[in-house]
Amino acid sequence: MLAQRTLKSLTKAVGVGLHSGQRVELTLRPAPPDTGIVFRRVDLPQPVDIVISAQAVTDTRLASTISAGGAKVHTVEHLMSACAGLGIDNLYIDITAEEVPILDGSASSFVFLLQSAGIELQSAPKRFIRVLKPVEVREGEGATAKWARLSPYEGYKLSFEIDFDHPAVDSTGQRVEFDLSSGSYSRDIARARTFGFTKDVEMMRANGLALGGGLDNAIVMDDYKVLNSEGLRYNDEFVKHKILDAMGDLYLLGKPLLAAYSAFRSGHAMNNKLLRELLAHQDAYEVVTFADEKRAPQGFATLARAW
């Protein structure tokens, strides 16, 4: 049986929110089979649980925000991406503020946290959502066009293309493909950091956003170059971060996908719109398990390696 996974023990982290600049503590705890991933706002007078789902996403401006019972958690995508990359099905996430800490701006710190706690196989089959027919969402035309698509695929593959007219981005790859069967999430994707431009940061801070952002947790560019003294972690770090974000956004479905995801200039809003479009067509997907893990698509049966 290809089994569900949780943590062997709890693990903690402290950081600041990218947009709020607020100090926040995270405690990641094991959860029973079929729990799913549950954020718990423990700072509130009455703690509120927010179970991840496509419908729980209530805001997609600059990040993915989930809500329930009047409580919110912002910027969940990097932690969700790490859970997707390591195949974590069940997890309690206690959080002391309304934004997940940005840490180093990638998913690598979350991968380290999860792996340091240890990953435990559980006595219940892992449930996948297998895409049976193509589903697509589009916006704009010509130079403003953007789209995202899910297609049938016996595995999990993502391809993404960006289109930034900037010297630092032009000199790197603007398209990348990652297949879970042949690549390593921890090595190939997890270390890609979020990025932004100085002109946008100034505007966001004037609006009370990006208050926790800086050169230690983002790639920052002026009109011509990358300002971080250490440079890039990957030659194509910009577009790889978009893959990282997409994996996190898609994992908000609540189950891992068996599908090929492809996108052009997509973002948090379009990724969530794609999930809702999939769920709106019940003939476009099915829920499957694998009694014999040898029959499962390559890449899901082995625990992800550290880099």
UniProtKB/Swiss-Prot annotation:
Which Enzyme Commission numbers does its entry carry? 3.5.1.108
Instruction: List the catalysed reactions.
Output: a UDP-3-O-[(3R)-3-hydroxyacyl]-N-acetyl-alpha-D-glucosamine + H2O = a UDP-3-O-[(3R)-3-hydroxyacyl]-alpha-D-glucosamine + acetate
Q: Which GO terms describe its cellular component?
A: membrane
Q: For Zn(2+), which residues are the binding ones?
A: 78, 241, 245
Name the enzyme group at the top EC level.
hydrolase
Key word Phosphoprotein present:
no
Any one of the GO BP annotations: lipid A biosynthetic process
Instruction: Name the cofactor(s).
Output: Zn(2+)
Q: Which residues form the active site?
A: 268 (proton donor)
Matches recorded under InterPro entries: Ribosomal_Su5_D2-typ_SF, UDP-acyl_GlcNac_deAcase, UDP-acyl_GlcNac_deAcase_C, UDP-acyl_N-AcGlcN_deAcase_N
Q: Give a GO molecular function annotation for the protein.
A: UDP-3-O-acyl-N-acetylglucosamine deacetylase activity
Pathway participation: Glycolipid biosynthesis; lipid IV(A) biosynthesis; lipid IV(A) from (3R)-3-hydroxytetradecanoyl-[acyl-carrier-protein] and UDP-N-acetyl-alpha-D-glucosamine: step 2/6
Q: Which UniProt keywords apply?
A: Hydrolase, Lipid A biosynthesis, Lipid biosynthesis, Lipid metabolism, Metal-binding, Zinc
**Pfam families, per the entry:** LpxC
User: Superkingdom of the source?
Assistant: Bacteria
Q: What the protein does?
A: Catalyzes the hydrolysis of UDP-3-O-myristoyl-N-acetylglucosamine to form UDP-3-O-myristoylglucosamine and acetate, the committed step in lipid A biosynthesis.
* Family designation: Belongs to the LpxC family.
What's the name of the protein? UDP-3-O-acyl-N-acetylglucosamine deacetylase
The primary gene name is lpxC
